[in-house]
Structure formats: structure tokens, C-alpha cells
Amino acid sequence: MASAMVCCARLGWRARYVGRFGSDELGDIGRTSLTNEGVDVSAAEVVAGAQTRFAMIIVDGRTGDRTVLWDRDPRLALSAADVPAAAVRTSRILLVDCDDVEASVAAATVAREAGVITAIDVEAVLPGLDRLLPLIDIVIASEGFPERWTASSETGRALERLHAELQPALTCVTLGPQGSLARCGGREIRTPAFRVPCVDTTGAGDAFRGGFIAALLQHGPEDVDVLLRMANAVAALKCRTAGAREGLPHAAELEALLAEDTRGTGVPQ
């Protein structure tokens, strides 16, 4: 989530992170790194005595694929009462994840009432998602989620069923080197990935979501193909460099890739 906000900030948009840090050195580093990237952390809380979430990432040097090992201090969890409603109401787009489903439900409810666009980063089938997902305008799922949610074995059919059930403006699944597959209205849109040297895929999903949000802010919702192409380009550029954020592009880098490579054009079905 934090990396998606950094992505938006690098592409020229104001971004705010809502969450919790521990009162440790890693927490100080995390807050400072976001502030240095131009992300507003005024709505983020420091929890006394808690340890900041830490992950160990193992990267396959041949493919750039990664395995993530992590643990989270339960004191970092957000409840519905912890949601800063004023910060949500003054946003243009709210992106939530599923770390704290009740908090995400509360935030999405406030956003809906205020006319704020809602988006979600969803990976796993969790308790409470049946209440959260209907509040979402833009569903961006990780590979495998549509199949798990719908008990359908084929990705395209699973995404179609997910979209029909939830009826958001857009339902999308990221597919790594295969790009993305989305449904918007009655259309299925396959967007190929951009071909770049892949060093590390860590954070590619955050990059895709941040790239999509930045594209939506820039271009509006009319041409979904353009938004998906930009999101795929941002994710590809991130994978050039090790680390979750180091490769996140600035606007000039993104524009250069979009100008030189036309293979990420959406293919409507």
C-alpha cells in the first residue's frame, strides 16, 4: 500500500498514507522514506512499543520472482474506529487493502457516502470480504483470486463471474509476465505486459495499482485501455531494479516507455 502511494507521488500526484508504524528504528525509517517521497503521513499513527512490520524477500536471480516472509505486530492493526474519516472525504480516490478488513469497510463506506472513488488491492479470500467488495468501484486482484472467489478454474470465466457478482466499474486481475485481464461493462480487455529486463518483481502489484490510479487521475475513466496500458508500463519499469520502490518511475520515464513500446495496447474481446 505504501509503495502504491510512492508510485502516485513520483508520477506527480498528491498521496496520503493511512496506517500504523511501530515506535522503533524501522518505523522511523518507514515514515521518513515516505515523507522524502512526498507522501503525506499526517494520518499515520505511531504505536508505542510496537514493532514495525518487517519482511524478508528472497529473489530468484534467474527470473526475478520472489518469495516473501513476513510478520506483523497485532498492535499495528486498524479498527473501524481508527479510520480518519476527514482524510477519506477529502480524497479523490481511496485505495484499500485487506490487512484490516473492518477498517477497509469503514473507510470505503465513508468514501462512498462522500462520492470518492474506491479501489482495492485484493489477494486472498478472507472473512468480511463479502461486505467490503460491494463497496468497491475498481477491483484489482492478484493472480488466482478470481478463481478462488468463484470456484472457477479458468481465469477469464472466473473474472467474468466476479465482475457480474460485484458489478464494479472495473474488475481486473494482474498476471505478471502475461500483463493483465480486465472486465469493464460487457468488455473483456487483455493488456500485454511490457518487455523489460526483469531483476525483481517485488512491489510490481503495488506499482500496477499506483500506476492505474495515477492514470485515472490524469486521463479520467473514459478510456480504460489507456489506464491499463499505463498501469502495466509502471509495473514493468519497477521490475528493472531490485527492491519494492527503487524502480518506481517518474513521469518522464513512463512517458518514454509508452512512446517507444506499443506492445502494451489493450485487446478488447
Predicted regions and their residues:
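Alpha-helix C-terminal capping segments
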Residues: 5-14, 215-218
